[in-house]
Amino acid sequence: MKIIEYEERYLEDVKDLLVELEEYILTIDKDELDQLHPEYREKMAILDLKELEENNGKCFLAVEDNKAIGLIMGTIIQYDENDYLDYKCPKSGEITELIVTTKIRSTGVGQALMNKMEEYFKYLGCEYIFVDVFAYNQKGINFYNKQGYHPRMHIGIKKI
């Protein structure tokens, strides 16, 4: 297994990985608000990659036997002029996606992807890395906790 920067020849694998992640989210979404729209597979990867391009981001792939088996995407957080009113706004990266195909989870692939993204953010001079994790994704939360991440915000939801 090797970690490489995204190459277009792996686009179909990226689409498959993002669908796998969304399908997993659907199984744990107690609020039943997530969905896998018929256009998700064709559009989501393109939208994510465009966001990376616009925000000095990167996508790294874990590749084995010429197939992407995991990915991580991250961008540089863009602050606006009003953010500075109540926040110090240190240069920070944000992990926007992380998925390792089910068959090889817990084999170190996620850790290798995290290490590569953290290395990239450090290279750019980031002081912090943010990550949003779906509240019902306990496996994801546990993984990030093991990597030294801790909760900073809590977003609640209530059906009315």
Give names to the regions the model predicted.
Residues I104, G108-K116:
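Conserved acetyl-CoA pyrophosphate-binding loop and the N-cap/start of the following alpha-helix
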Residues L61, K67-I76, E94, I99:
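Conserved beta-strand in the GNAT
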Residues F121-D132:
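Conserved GNAT acetyl-CoA-binding A-motif
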Residues I46-L61, E94:
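A short helix-loop-beta-strand connector motif used in the catalytic cores of GNAT acetyltransferases and
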Residues E23-D48:
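Conserved GNAT-fold acetyl-CoA-binding loop/helix
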Residues F130-G140, I157-I160:
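Conserved beta-strand-loop-alpha-helix junction that forms the acyl-donor binding cleft
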Residues K2-I28:
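A short beta-loop-alpha structural element at the N-terminal edge
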Residues M73-G93:
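Conserved acyl-donor/pantetheine-binding loop and adjacent beta-alpha core of acyl/acetyltransferases
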